[in-house]
């Protein structure tokens, strides 16, 4: 298989960048972890003047019932928007602005986090504010009403966005009855019912040392960290032992669910099984998913003109899945093209050249994204929570070297067996049987709609 000119021109540059970034990583002090009051603290010396600290609360959508979806997102936002016992919202933000520091909160399906970012010389000023935000948030009634209404307005706006709507339907259908069916930001119905008292009580119920993980990227002495983190954790109860649940998504048959919507085109999303984080198949499947993205894009858009932005992606969370997404006016032709492509890929496999090139592209992109302290902290945190191995963020280069072409082809065949499809648009244009039947055996792709004549 001959490589496109893009690859022949850029692969040497990518390899050079990867080598430079790897060399830079090796010059920094070695990362380490320690346990303080039962909480793991991961420390990556940064070699620069920026300090990034991320405190994670594990559990995500496992922490609340479906009728309370959105409560954790609202609570985390309140930590940075509703003041503390010592400062009003304005006073709190003014103190951060004076030293150009930032505090930010996030709530996801697997964990939530509160992050601080500042320069090393301001650490002693910002750290007490960070501790107050975690341990004594005010949950001021007036400020809470503001962020509560903001959350509702965002959900209303998202409901009218087809890409958001189809993804929400896909999760609710594929993971029905499971935690991953819940959306971290909730729904308009669930969030509207939430009030300041129950949101505050909920936050304090999940703020336990048994759920925490702390990640530090910066140049801070170990003794100073031990003292400051120890004081922080002394104000937080131990809580009951907590173990993250890992639920495998593995549909046993193809399914198709349609919802009529008045849209300019039709939106389709399918979910298949995928390896869970921390398993032997994960890295190989990550490569397979990325290569298939390129093949899918080429076949669906370039060769058949069926969609402007076809996509596939590997969601490697605690309930992992492989996602296929497209918007098209010809859903029946699309599924025929997709099935033929999947079958051809299963029969003929990915090539050694494709796997080699994707390793380089994947690693280079990963290292570039980890140039900032924030990106490094996020990578360390995700790998610890999902893979139970924070060092994977550092060893990925060596880990991928061990993945063979045979591994990549094996996992693609293993996991892409059955698809849970959802559809929004005109149901009359989609034949459900085409989506639910077993994959065809034909290797020949439907002919391209695009002309191959050169200008």
Label every PLM stretch briefly.
Residues 4, 93-202, 340, 355-374:
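Acidic/histidine-enriched segments that form metal/cofactor-coordinating
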Residues 26-33, 173-212, 244-246, 366, ...:
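Histidine-acidic residue clusters that define the catalytic metal-binding segment
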Residues 27, 176, 181-184, 209-276, ...:
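An aromatic/glycine/proline-enriched structural segment found at the starts
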Residues 28, 54-117, 183, 291-306:
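M16/MPP (pitrilysin/insulinase) zinc-metallopeptidase core fold and M16-derived inactive scaffolds
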Residues 35, 213-216, 325, 356-455:
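C-terminal regions of mature proteins
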Residues 81-87, 117-148, 314-369, 442-455:
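M16/insulysin-pitrilysin zinc metalloprotease superfamily fold
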Residues 152-168, 252-265, 302-303, 348-398:
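Short acidic/His-enriched helical or mixed secondary-structure segments at domain edges of catalytic enzymes
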Residues 267-271, 289-327:
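A structural supersecondary motif
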